[in-house]
């Protein structure tokens, strides 16, 4: 058959099959996929090479040293009924601890909100306090049997496509974090990383950007029986941060 207009996924370790199918189906380009790489045998076989990169993940070494530069989101606790004029709400009780970590910096706390959901009235900051050690918010002077919520900023500590591949494709490797390109330090790091990537991938003819900066919003719960709390496959929930709000 003719050659051209067809891109074939390939993978290191499957050279013979990849090149056989490329010839049989008339591929003009071979590409990698999330979690796969192409061997020299494939990249030097005379085909165009598409290389996949996600700018904001797979930088765990840098992310571990700059954990205040991770992407964030707002989380809101489920409404909880008060049985007296005081109430304590565990912020992460309903959320997946492998995905989120509370951002309890002084700058972040300025944007936390506690609401009486029965009356839809915001609780004054003087009427609640945060316990860092317990990860909980305690309310006082509230109305018994009204329901209350806390919205707070949380760091994302497990990138969602990495989560998806672990749970769907049974990956068994380090959880990938995602970094936020809004920060000047992150931008400087990423520009250097991109320059190095281009220099070390001379066989690449097309770069396939995937997931870009913020995408694929998954918010998982702590209960295995109710893991998927919210999903949106094209969203901006994860663009928020203290610098963005400022």
Question: Where is each model-derived feature located?
Answer:
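Glycan-processing catalytic domains of CAZymes
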Residues: 1-246
């Amino acid at each position: 058959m003719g050659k051209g207009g067809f891109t074939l996924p390939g993978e290191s370790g499957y050279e013979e099959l990849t090149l056989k199918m490329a010839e049989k189906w008339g591929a003009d380009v071979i590409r990698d996929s999330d979690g796969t790489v192409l061997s020299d045998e494939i990249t030097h076989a005379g085909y165009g090479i598409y290389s996949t990169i996600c700018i904001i993940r797979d930088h765990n070494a840098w992310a571990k040293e700059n954990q205040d530069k991770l992407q964030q989101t707002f989380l809101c606790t489920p409404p909880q009924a008060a049985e007296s004029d005081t109430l304590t709400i565990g912020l992460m009780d309903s959320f997946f601890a492998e995905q989120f970590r509370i951002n309890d910096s002084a700058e972040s706390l300025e944007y936390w909100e506690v609401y009486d959901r029965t009356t839809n009235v915001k609780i004054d900051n003087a009427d609640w306090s945060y316990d860092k050690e317990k990860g909980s918010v305690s309310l006082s002077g509230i109305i018994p049997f009204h329901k209350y919520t806390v919205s707070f900023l949380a760091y994302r500590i497990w990138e969602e496509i990495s989560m998806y591949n672990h749970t769907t494709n049974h990956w068994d490797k380090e959880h990938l974090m995602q970094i936020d390109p809004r920060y000047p330090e992150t931008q400087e790091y990423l520009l250097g990383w991109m320059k190095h990537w281009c220099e070390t991938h001379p066989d690449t003819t097309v770069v396939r950007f995937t997931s870009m900066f913020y995408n694929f919003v998954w918010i998982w719960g702590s209960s295995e029986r109710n893991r998927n709390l919210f999903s949106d496959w094209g969203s901006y929930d994860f663009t928020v941060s203290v610098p963005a709000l400022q």
